[in-house]
Structure formats: C-alpha cells, structure tokens
C-alpha cells in the first residue's frame, strides 16, 4: 500500500522544531506516510493561496501541528480554511506535551486535538483517511 501523502500545517514562526520532529518520523521505514508539502514562509498573496490550494488538493490528508501560538497564526488559519474548502480530511496534533497548545482559528468545535505519540499518530492518519471515505452500501441494501 502506498504511503499516505500529508500536508503539514504549523506555525513557522514558533514551531519549526515540531516540523522537524514530524518530518523525521515520516522518514521512518514503517511510517506509512510522507510529508508531500508543508507551510511555507512566502508572503501570503493570491499566488500563495493558489499554490497552497494545489498542494493541499494533491495530498490525502492534512495534519495541523498545534503549538502555544497556533491560534494567532494567520498562515495556519488560511491553510486550514483551504483544507476545509477542498474537503480534505485533517486532524489537530498537540505539539508540546508540557505546554498549553492552542487550536487554530477556523477549527471546528468538534475538531479534537490528539496527543502526539507514535501510536496515536499512526492511528489518526489511518482513521482520519478511512472516516473521510464514503461508505459503500451493498446493492441489496440500496433503495429501489
């Protein structure tokens, strides 16, 4: 089975170390996922929006790494908005165990933030993708 392609959204000004950690984990031979694209430092313009939209459209799902200042990150908010508009599955990852992490502006009330352990990360990648796929109904159960 091919690796799950991920767009990694994070606060570049404050959480570069979290980016590095997830990137390192993705390179493990048995990870089952790859970071195909990530937040960039480019100025946010219409061109930036189009580029990020193309990148998010090309992945299977989005991981939003949440740190202490994620709620005030305009870039993370925009990336999450694009993921929602493109109907890409995503989940929020609690980036710092010992600190209070904030949800990005624009996140939904029912978006859960998951602890970051290897097992939870693996489970969330698989279940987020599985839950986003339409469920198939056997012919015999369909209404005529």
Predicted segments, located by residue:
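C-terminal helix of von Willebrand factor
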Residues: 113-144
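Conserved TIR/SEFIR loop-to-helix hotspot centered on a Trp-containing motif
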Residues: 68-86
